[in-house]
């Protein structure tokens, strides 16, 4: 953490900052002096004036130090300066200021400042925590206030800035100085508000405050004055550790090499003034003494001790120069001349002209913190050079250094210091070793070095992968092509996006890299692009760029059209570029730089002309030009055959890629570009330079040369040949006429050499045997390939007609090589013998004749060439060899003669330098980078290597503890052994600690189980026993009531109905067919309790019974039970009396209301409350016989004066009255649910009828309008508005109470049994309406009950509850039903049958007023006689499908009824013990209730009750009732009876058949069209688009969806298309089937996910729709119809759909490429591919290539919880377990679903989890598999147990490992242009 601090606590520091600060402080100092002038003798205290202000920054040590300085300067050794001495007062006009200056100057002299030097303190330091923060400002605003602000230098941190405000808090204790700290944390994200908090220093409230305190204290730790002011002391323990590490590091680095004497010059680094001389003198007493002689001054004697170097430096320092003697001793006692390097830090003090303080010890190496303490760190680090890790060298010759210097680094190393030889290239060795390790197949090793290298290699790879890419390559490339591009441009970080395709993609990528190279080189601005692509420039970050793009030919014109088309679609590109269609040499835009990327049509003269026209200094361009164009037979292939360059005459042809257009360029232009290096144009000389080459891609630059010396210059340029591994062969071919022609081909050098060597080795002469051997070797040398297990030979580059000539050349060359070898060997062998004189003369004659022969031969050949064809002559003459080995280099040489005029032209470089110096003339130090860098650890490179070899690559868990162990071990052994033993000790301690934790945890769990489980079981059975005892008297009472009720029912039997004839009315609402999950208790706790406490259960029960009997006997003897019974009967008599009950209720409501209002107004008093209640009781007693509510109301409000007179405001009267009455009403309603208070509450409610006359004229409708009017008045007159509001609203509630509750209870008292039977029916509504009319005085005369209009829901209420019940009607049964009734001899009851409520499940209030005629199906009405155990098919597919579906639904109802019957029987037999019922049933779909409110699920794992809503329930007599009916004993129900969907489906099917079981309505299937689309193909989107088009054209249409989720998705899409009220046109299949009895006529019908239905279900639906066109969408390969009845097969569920013609689609917008690959290759059980046309992604955004991942788990706890992921399971049990795990970890965005529930949905990330190890058919089902892997767009993760990593999903994901990326990319649709 770099700190930049301006200290404002000490005046000695602030006075040196600037004059303004000094003047301000002088004014502060002079204030006490002006006041002092009025005092006698001008004597006052000097501490405030001399030692600085304010007092908070002064410490005792600073005061003593300053007083000591004043005594020495003023020569007053015993003066305490409490008063100004007289001599000082008389001598100076302002003695306070003068004494302050004297003190300050003395301090400066003490630290080494001279009188003529103005020192500037720059207080910047590094914090001890080293966390990358930088303090930008640090000052005090007032006397006791401190402000610190810090800016974060870490780029990845979220925090931007921290600020502290430290303020001193007043304290009674003068020795305590508490400070309050307010800090603010600013974030980099502007959307996050700053975080502000405060705390007391050294007393943080939380962890955040503690962190802020640590950062604050670490930033001020280096400043003593601030530390003293804040009472902060450094952690001594931490300081000891730092000092030990520092000492160890210093010792390691000082003793590096053996001591060798050296001779140093007297002049250390600069010239030393000749006036200073240093001589060494030796004395017997004093020892060695240096005598420093200066001209004109006295000699100075310096003792040669351990401070001699420092003292000599201070004595000889003069103007930045100093002189040291070689015999001077350092702090270690070593002579200065023996130090090979070090002490460069002396130059720091010399350059600053500062003396070395006394506390500095002259070691050869000095830490940067010492220089910082001396105020020289900022000055020194500008010229620091990093020699090695932790070692710095101060170089006085540097102007600016870029080295990272830290205050913990050591300064003093020599710049020539050489690192250890074996560590010099350590990074390269590690990198090379990591590459070799990564190339191996097996990366496992027990070597710690290998593990460490692998860890670092992986970290390096991760780091490189996270680096931001500079250039995006959008064209598709293979791996070889990508490697080729990255090898050509290793300096560019590229990202390959694979978004487009080209036949020559490599060269498109190369052009992109070349453009980026030039753009980056010139900082993306201020250049001209000759022939550039304007589209690429617009898309890049370039600005102020001019593009010259002329139309030179047809290709340029076509390019312009293509680029114009792209530009028309661009948006958001506003960079400043310019464009013209002129030639570059004809354009006049001024720029200094011109670039051209692969522009081959511009000659060098054109480029020079362009430079002159644009006023440019430099022209840079790139071209692909092979040097072989200088040969006539130029035919080369570059970049592994992707580019072919051929010379044809004077043109050079370029062939890019496998297919494409040919580009032709002038050969002479390309030759000039390669060979010409200097040329002249327009009187100017231009120099072409080859900057660099990347293969045959050359980068050139052209510059204007000025001020050239005249003379001749020879320039050479060389280029490497393109094909270095080839040789040229001239192969003869003889035609049918015997004419021999020669063809030139190129062949691999190694292949040809191997063949020649073989012939030379095996052949003696040319014969048939030699030809056979040569052909055999030729066949063996050809390249072979292995494909599909077969070995095949690849064809060679030699054509078939050239093979004989090629073999002939090989044989001739081989035999000739053999002969030459034989001849030369003999010649050389004979040359070993000394020749005779005759042989010498003979050889001279032969040599002369040989030269003459050559001359005559060549002359005759030249004549023949002149007379005949020279090429043919060359072919005949060149018989030496027909194999030519090509040269490796092409060298071009140019001789240039330069002549110049005498006129001297100014230099361009001089002009640029002058411009730079005039523009940037600031001091380089002021413009330098003042930022600090992060701290680095104290360790040398040797330490790093030791750690690398011994650490093993593990992470440090406890750095402090590790360092502490190392510090102990280091004192006993060497460094290498210390690291090794420290690792072993630390690993042993860590292992013991981990094992200890596990052992303690294990013991703790055992103790916890031993203590908790028996205690929990004991408490559970004690509570159950206590509840059982309490239920004994209630059971007796219930038995008596049961007998009474039975007798009463016999008397009123004529009111009873036949339950079997009741007709149910059900609303039709949408269904997802998804099972609902309920709440679960802690199943483990229950199971453990049962398993461990079964033994003691019986004993505890027996013990409890014995204790209970003894207690009852004891209490009976003591008479306590008798007294308890008396009190209980007395209290019960009070509650059963109506008058007492009303009095108690009035006391509670009146007192509570008055107390509440008194508390709200602040006037509450217990005495006033008691007096108020007594007064009200007296008034109530006096008016008890007179029912005057108004009188009571006035009297009650008058008693409010007991609290306070201003409390009797008019608005409080209606508030008090309304609160009391409403509270009383709600309390009575609640007490009705209590068994003990139910009777007296009913009687009290009935007595309220006498008060109805007070509100008989009150109309609710008018009151509602008055309420709205009061809201308007509130804005005009608040008091009046609130008065009306609080007066009207209680009156409305009271009116409803009288109409709905009081009247009903009075009727119920007369007809209790009848009212109970009629409750909740339409007849009950009629009766209640008649009663209200009877008791109302303004009733209508002559109106029949049947003619009463429909009332609002607020006026029709069931008994005892505030639930709205709409009007109901009774429908007539069908004729077929009547026949069945006649056959069954069922007599019709004179009373109307019982009907269920028709309340729709909707949030709209007014939908509850709809009236329906839905009835129970025939199967339920005539059960069990209506059972049918078989379904007989007729041969009609449509009818058989419908009847099969009807049979399945009836079977489902039969199973549900059987389950209900069994539960009822068990409940009656077991005495309603839910635990016993659960053990016998164990069905989570079944529910039981004892009171009608709390329902208990009958699963063994479920314990907690919940509120459920059912359409039908079964009572204890197995009578089916309405879901909200009153439960007397108990009731049971199941999930099926929530909506009774099967009943509604059966009713819809029954309407299709008449009494003779004939179909009266058949579905129309002629206009249907079926479309089979794969997952993610946009089925819902297609329907939405078609419907939107129909609705806009006013065409009647309807869309049906299988699930509610699909319906909502379709509605949402229609809303986005602008369709109003789209819910009218979109329904679910069940909703439409249940709610529509009439036939709907439409034009277009759209069905979504049609294959999820049973065919009979779909056909039944079509009978209710008359359509013209039907469009059905689905996927036959996804989850089909699921038969819930395990005993009834569904043979025809999909038969109808199989008969239809399906239109198949192959496109998807959702699935990634690997998912498309799996779906395209997926086969069914018969081996047929389910998606015959495959599945391809057609999304415009390039999809994810690999998205499927596989993970093995052991338990559900190992499944990671990802907030944005969607979790799927195969079964419901897995879903519940996974949901419980996710909820325990904090939950996620989406709830867990099964695969079936997720069909049709799309998610970004999907996690499929399998928790069970046993096989389930669902998990291997192909339809489940298709849905599971096709729900995601980016990522899919499959978590399965390790033992099931071979299931279907795992095998499919694992198979993708052997599929390459380029294979997967084929499943992305690409449109060819």
Curated annotation (Swiss-Prot):
Keywords: ATP-binding, Helicase, Hydrolase, Methyltransferase, Nucleotide-binding, Protease, Thiol protease, Transferase. It holds the Pfam family Vmethyltransf. Its EC number is 3.4.22.-, 2.1.1.-, 3.6.4.13. Residues 1538-1705 form the (+)RNA virus helicase ATP-binding domain. PROSITE patterns: ALPHAVIRUS_MT (PS51743), PSRV_HELICASE (PS51657). It catalyses: ATP + H2O = ADP + phosphate + H(+). Residues 1356-1381 are annotated as: Disordered. Residues 1706-1873 form the (+)RNA virus helicase C-terminal domain. GO terms for molecular function: ATP binding; ATP hydrolysis activity; cysteine-type peptidase activity; mRNA methyltransferase activity; RNA binding; RNA helicase activity. The keyword Membrane does not apply. This is Replicase polyprotein 1a.
